[in-house]
Design a protein with these regions (language model features):
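N-terminal leader/linker segments that initiate helical-solenoid repeat arrays
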Residues: 15-36
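Short helix-capping/linker turns of helical repeat alpha-solenoids
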Residues: 43-47, 59-61, 66, 79-83, ...
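Sec-dependent N-terminal signal peptides
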Residues: 4-13
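Terminal, low-structured helical/coil segments at or just beyond the last alpha-helical repeat
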Residues: 121-156
Length: 156
């Protein structure tokens, strides 16, 4: 039993160190190596790794820029409660880049969720997007926020 407890304590520490190493590689411009570090963590469900891969695809860092893949990686991390990725999803919906069209209802929804999660910039984005929305759109967004909030942030 003690062996399993130790494993449960040590594994998250190792995973966090791998993500930090990948961030360091990105800062050094070694994007291909960073991707090699991030993919196994992302495939095992690490939201930080998923968000960083989303950034790489969004900005074309070591990979060809691909808005559809960027959005997908951001969305994976967002559904796990990653506030930075949630702002990324909100931005994609607001601008409509890589999507059929902008969707202000969903943009607002994700900015609000990101703000709930603690992203300090999300409130600014939320204030800007709400200026472009009708009352009805805001009400629809709040229905989505309430749906997502209980699932993504069940204890808030």
């Amino acid at each position: 039993m003690l062996k399993y407890v130790i494993i449960l304590i040590v594994l998250p520490i190792i995973a966090a160190a791998e993500i930090e190493h990948a961030r360091d590689l990105m800062e050094e411009g070694q994007f291909e190596k960073a991707m090699q570090e991030l993919l196994p963590a992302a495939r095992s469900g690490n939201a930080d790794a998923e968000e960083l891969i989303g950034i790489m695809y969004a900005m074309g860092l070591g990979v060809k820029r691909d808005d559809i893949r960027a959005f997908d990686w951001y969305l994976r991390a967002s559904m796990k409660g990653h506030p930075g990725a949630q702002s990324g999803v909100g931005w994609y919906y607001e601008i409509g880049r890589g999507l059929p069209a902008p969707d202000l209802i969903r943009a607002y929804t994700w900015y609000v969720l990101s703000a709930i999660g603690g992203d300090p910039d999300a409130a600014i984005s939320q204030e800007e997007v709400v200026k472009k929305m009708t009352r009805e759109e805001i009400e629809k967004a709040h229905v989505l926020i309430n749906d997502y909030k209980v699932w993504i942030y069940p204890f808030r």
